[in-house]
């Protein structure tokens, strides 16, 4: 029986998606998240209340590697990459540890962390292996969380989904910048967008997004390609959405203003509290007006509008 290696990385909650993505880039065959916030105050869809769980600042990202991988080298590489990012994000004290698993352990271990999750009024994210029956009006997004790049339950992704639900009415063209898992593109299609163009700089993310899109039926209107933000893009859009780090977001704002149609929207997420003013000022300097601002914990998500009628915007 084949042996697998389990690498556990403990970081502050803000580092969940960053660490998950890096572990996948470093060859992980699956990633699981342990977060006490997933259970605090939760009630499942059948009304059962989860046991009391003490809220922790830290989460555990667990990655799974074949026995042929030098996990010590992965640890060293991950530590080096995280050290380069300390100016952009407070990860706290990073702790790592490894355990050997059998094939059977691996097959069951990471899947136990994922259950169907109702994210917004309309949208529910369902692991690809789950037999789930939707209720009336419920829109299902099937994802393979083992591929990482965003499982849809991180605050930045949740708020992005709420924002899309707010602005999409049907028939729109959407640009999804830094698509990751493809979850925002899939949601846009389910919410009625006519065409979605998804971009990511990471070739692995492009592949993962395409595979997740193929898990969902009727997604032929989503086009995925490698791309560096919006450089070289000439497609006019009704909505542009980007869930990436604030220091990267500010570099796409001018191109977003160029491409978004009049009365169109720019949704930005992935913004920690200390970077919010910087992002807001950059967007307003480009000509956008803030329409909606959402906050969950340390994270900010915003909906900016390109409009001459500022009566309905914040500060208008």
From Swiss-Prot:
This enzyme's EC code(s): 2.1.1.-
Q: Which GO terms describe its biological process?
A: methylation
Instruction: Tell me one GO molecular function of this protein.
Output: protein-lysine N-methyltransferase activity
**Which UniProt keywords are listed?**
Cytoplasm, Methyltransferase, S-adenosyl-L-methionine, Transferase
User: Where is it located?
Assistant: Cytoplasm
Q: Where does S-adenosyl-L-methionine bind?
A: 157, 178, 200, 243
**A UniProt-annotated Pfam family:** PrmA
Kindly list the GO CC terms recorded for this protein. Answer: cytoplasm
Q: According to its UniProt record, which protein family does this protein belong to?
A: Belongs to the methyltransferase superfamily. PrmA family.
The record's section on HAMAP family has:
Methyltr_PrmA
The name this protein goes by in its record: Ribosomal protein L11 methyltransferase
Instruction: List the source organism.
Output: Streptococcus pneumoniae (strain Taiwan19F-14)
